[in-house]
């Protein structure tokens, strides 16, 4: 799943760490906001709601990764990007079904009952949020992989960076350290 490249493994792990941290912060802010705006709800409910959402998001983070590996943002042919539609739907469905099941379990253990309401309208609401999250995860994967590959280029020993000069059919490679200035012939 992660590939044999160390870059891909690190891309997934760094993205996972960043996503888990950012979503935890957002969920903590949601708990604070709910507790402030509706103090009659207490703290337990919002903690269970936001905690179950965070946990299932983390558990199903591999789904956007699969989508990214199937169709990175700059993939050719472009129609392959359509692979993100079923992946985003699967991610949202697993996230929502997962947190609903966790909430039902926690409420049951506490001697209570959790009611998510009508599934379709609530799922469509969550789908919009999860689709945005999915897109941000894909962008995060692309950014992190790009940065890691750039770092890898810099750290490669003995590598000299060159600038290609084309003059008709002739190609001249000049070491970047030998270039003082670049000007165009106006073509």
Predicted segments with their positions:
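Hydrophobic alpha-helices of bacterial signal-transduction systems
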Residues: 1-152
């Amino acid at each position: 799943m992660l590939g044999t490249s160390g870059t891909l493994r690190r891309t997934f792990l760094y993205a996972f760490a960043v996503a888990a941290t950012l979503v935890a912060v957002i969920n903590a802010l949601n708990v604070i906001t709910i507790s402030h705006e509706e103090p009659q709800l207490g703290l337990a409910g919002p903690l269970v709601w936001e905690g179950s959402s965070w946990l299932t998001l983390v558990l199903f983070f591999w789904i956007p990764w699969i989508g990214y590996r199937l169709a990175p943002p700059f993939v050719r042919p472009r129609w392959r990007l359509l692979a993100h539609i079923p992946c985003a739907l699967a991610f949202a469905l697993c996230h929502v079904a997962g947190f609903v099941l966790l909430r039902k379990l926690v409420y049951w253990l506490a001697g209570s009952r959790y009611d998510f309401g009508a599934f379709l309208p609530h799922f469509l609401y969550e789908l919009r949020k999860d689709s945005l999250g999915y897109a941000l995860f894909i962008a995060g994967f692309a950014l992190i992989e790009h940065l890691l590959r750039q770092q890898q280029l810099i750290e490669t020993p003995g590598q000299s960076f060159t600038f290609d000069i084309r003059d008709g059919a002739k190609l001249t490679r000049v070491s970047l350290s030998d270039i003082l200035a670049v000007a165009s012939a106006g073509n």
